[in-house]
Amino acid sequence: MPAVSLPPKENALFKRILRCYEHKQYRNGLKFCKQILSNPKFAEHGETLAMKGLTLNCLGKKEEAYELVRRGLRNDLKSHVCWHVYGLLQRSDKKYDEAIKCYRNALKWDKDNLQILRDLSLLQIQMRDLEGYRETRYQLLQLRPAQRASWIGYAIAYHLLEDYEMAAKILEEFRKTQQTSPDKVDYEYSELLLYQNQVLREAGLYREALEHLCTYEKQICDKLAVEETKGELLLQLCRLEDAADVYRGLQERNPENWAYYKGLEKALKPANMLERLKIYEEAWTKYPRGLVPRRLPLNFLSGEKFKECLDKFLRMNFSKGCPPVFNTLRSLYKDKEKVAIIEELVVGYETSLKSCRLFNPNDDGKEEPPTTLLWVQYYLAQHYDKIGQPSIALEYINTAIESTPTLIELFLVKAKIYKHAGNIKEAARWMDEAQALDTADRFINSKCAKYMLKANLIKEAEEMCSKFTREGTSAVENLNEMQCMWFQTECAQAYKAMNKFGEALKKCHEIERHFIEITDDQFDFHTYCMRKITLRSYVDLLKLEDVLRQHPFYFKAARIAIEIYLKLHDNPLTDENKEHEADTANMSDKELKKLRNKQRRAQKKAQIEEEKKNAEKEKQQRNQKKKKDDDDEEIGGPKEELIPEKLAKVETPLEEAIKFLTPLKNLVKNKIETHLFAFEIYFRKEKFLLMLQSVKRAFAIDSSHPWLHECMIRLFNTAVCESKDLSDTVRTVLKQEMNRLFGATNPKNFNETFLKRNSDSLPHRLSAAKMVYYLDPSSQKRAIELATTLDESLTNRNLQTCMEVLEALYDGSLGDCKEAAEIYRANCHKLFPYALAFMPPGYEEDMKITVNGDSSAEAEELANEI
């Protein structure tokens, strides 16, 4: 349909529509649209229809908006306004690729439209279409050479494309146009100079970068950045004496910065350990209260010199009462010799302080205050916990608590000792005690909630967090709004442990949405950072966003989700009622009565909680509705609700698992778990070449990893030994690669070789034992013997590995072996007396945990039992 041009009156109204949109006066904009469209001559005016659609989209009426914009576009296909509006609509729905196409169509009809070019450049940088971004920024520079954003955007395009020299030239040309006095300090000009210097450094032009820094030093506001950069550049240019002077100056600014001592070491190049120590001894004299110059030498000293320096360091900290001293020394615990020296010194302090209130009976000087002994005991509790002696650790911390029962840090350490010893429920109880001492401390509150989640006390954890969340909304919803990912990952883990897979997946998907939101949030900074010239931070932001899913929170959520989807594929959820009936069929009358009572109590409790939850939800919905009515600027509709039941009964669990796996394969290639999870998925999909690829990538990271060994045996056995309908090409590739990985052998021999090579490692023995049973179920007895050995000579005979062995005995990885599992549990209980996993049957049922002294539920249950 040919375009209809508006007469002056309607054209003036149309301009008012545009102004209303720009000023977010959407209701007024709709009135003006109605005035134009009510005229029969202009009822189908494309641009007005498009603008009406765009305005409605801003009011949340998405379907109507799309219908109007498409109608407008059909009526005027050659209108840049219609195409631009359609692009804006797609952009609001995060369909950036489609929006880019719309903008390109708009530019066909108005190639020099500044607004469309700017919008296009934003989408290109968002989607990292760097070549396209450079072209668009060049067009903007040609059209508006006087605007600084045009120059800066063009320079950033070259910087991101790693054409540093061109970026530096553009920035220099732009800098020349900036009229600033050499003595005047202007923040934006300062940031421009620092960004220009960063580009020169990344280009490897260190001499030019140093000259640039010295020339414009007076005009740069960030003096610290100038000195730090100068130090790095002088080191790069081997001007070591000058670099040493710079780092000494930086130490005067902040004697507690580790990086300055490292820089000074590089500049002075000490020939031996004594010369290296001399650097720090000078700092002791200069900064007598400095902790870092006393701590860093402990990393490289050994023997008597280490003991001498450590003695001074510990005395200073214990006298002052410095709680984090153990965390400061934690990295030294990799060295057994240093651990022995630490223990000797601190145990000596404790003995001496008890007898004469001095660190050493031969010391001269005034006596130490009683708190010094407290901090020594506090340290010893953490020390023995770290070296795996929880009984001694508990003795020390209990003594400390008896002397000072109001110190929160002591309860925190006691909780940690129980956690590391394997009793997370007792740990949660003690963390709750700590929280009760200071209910206004958010850190303790969060720690307590985290321990409760680890103990699968989800409701209690939610109640704990609710003390610091917004009123009128549920704690869980508010924590999700705040993107509180530590809470959600722990929640997901707890639900997974309780086999509530739907709830766990909901948390994993919520975390996935947070990362999508964080990626989308960068959109606002593309224009803001160029306007404010915060260019260094902006480039760092872009680089961070590119590797965002490397973050541990995402990896943890993805791992939990993949594990659940694999379980759902292996054992799809069935009708729970039928399973429940099968379970109760074998119960005695007394047991059945007890169960029914328990079910009634649980049902009553659930009903009360549901009513409470519904009331909260109604209140929350009222608040949200009010907020929505007040806010006419809301864009887009609500997100799809995550329903646990629906998530747990997904039809294609492996495809869902791949969605979480893909970012890990792209960004977390250095973690072996990424490739082993990939193998587990492709093994179930029978994608042999992808299985092989995963194994090879994992092999390159750690060829002797126990889990990798299991994957290799399964691949070997499935692809080569079992007959499969494989194409000749695939079979040939598999055989060639398998020969490279395994050599001329069979799975059994390969497993035996692996076992001989790693016979002193418990995790490796467990993997080999699983494969012994997998390859030959008749060898079950040998497999169990291999896995359940608890010799002291074995490496990694720790709590975690022993729990994995017990799980393998229960889950069928070593066949049906309940008797062997019970014997192994009893043996492990002697080794790890505090661990819940190895407690006698019925122990957990007898153990009750109350949160902040609330034992009403326990009393009610006891009454019902009677």
UniProtKB/Swiss-Prot annotation:
Pfam families: NatA_aux_su, TPR_8. InterPro entries: NatA_aux_su, TPR-like_helical_dom_sf, TPR_rpt. GO terms for cellular component: cytoplasm; cytosol; intracellular membrane-bounded organelle; membrane; NatA complex; nuclear body; nucleus; transcription regulator complex. The keyword Cytoplasm applies. GO terms for molecular function: acetyltransferase activator activity; ribosome binding; RNA binding. TPR repeats lie at residues 46-79, 80-113, 148-184, 224-257, 374-407, 409-441, 485-518, 672-705. Keywords: Acetylation, Angiogenesis, Cytoplasm, Developmental protein, Differentiation, Disease variant, Intellectual disability, Nucleus, Phosphoprotein, Repeat, TPR repeat, Transcription, Transcription regulation. GO terms for biological process: angiogenesis; cell differentiation; N-terminal protein amino acid acetylation; negative regulation of apoptotic process; positive regulation of DNA-templated transcription; protein stabilization. The modification Phosphoserine is found at residues 302, 537, 588, 855-856. The modification N6-acetyllysine is found at residues 262, 735, 756. Residues 595-604 have a biased composition (Basic residues). Expressed at high levels in testis and in ocular endothelial cells. Also found in brain (corpus callosum), heart, colon, bone marrow and at lower levels in most adult tissues, including thyroid, liver, pancreas, mammary and salivary glands, lung, ovary, urogenital system and upper gastrointestinal tract. Overexpressed in gastric cancer, in papillary thyroid carcinomas and in a Burkitt lymphoma cell line (Daudi). Specifically suppressed in abnormal proliferating blood vessels in eyes of patients with proliferative diabetic retinopathy. It is found in: Cytoplasm; Nucleus. Residues 500-866 are annotated as: Interaction with HYPK. Changing residue 834 to F/A: Reduces NatA complex stability and reduces catalytic activity. Changing residue 112 to N: In MRD50; uncertain significance. It comes from the Eukaryota. Residues 579-594, 606-621 have a biased composition (Basic and acidic residues). Cleaved by caspases during apoptosis, resulting in a stable 35 kDa fragment. Its main location: cytoplasm. Residues 579-642 are annotated as: Disordered. A motif (Bipartite nuclear localization signal) lies at residues 612-629. Auxillary subunit of N-terminal acetyltransferase complexes which display alpha (N-terminal) acetyltransferase (NAT) activity. The NAT activity may be important for vascular, hematopoietic and neuronal growth and development. Required to control retinal neovascularization in adult ocular endothelial cells. In complex with XRCC6 and XRCC5 (Ku80), up-regulates transcription from the osteocalcin promoter. It is linked to Intellectual developmental disorder, autosomal dominant 50, with behavioral abnormalities: A disorder characterized by significantly below average general intellectual functioning associated with impairments in adaptive behavior and manifested during the developmental period. Component of the N-terminal acetyltransferase A complex (also called the NatA complex) composed of NAA10 and NAA15. Within the complex interacts with NAA10. Component of the N-terminal acetyltransferase A (NatA)/HYPK complex at least composed of NAA10, NAA15 and HYPK, which has N-terminal acetyltransferase activity. In complex with NAA10, interacts with HYPK. Component of the N-terminal acetyltransferase E (NatE) complex at least composed of NAA10, NAA15 and NAA50. Within the complex interacts with NAA10; the interaction is required for binding to NAA50. Interacts with NAAT50. This is N-alpha-acetyltransferase 15, NatA auxiliary subunit. It comes from Homo sapiens (Human).
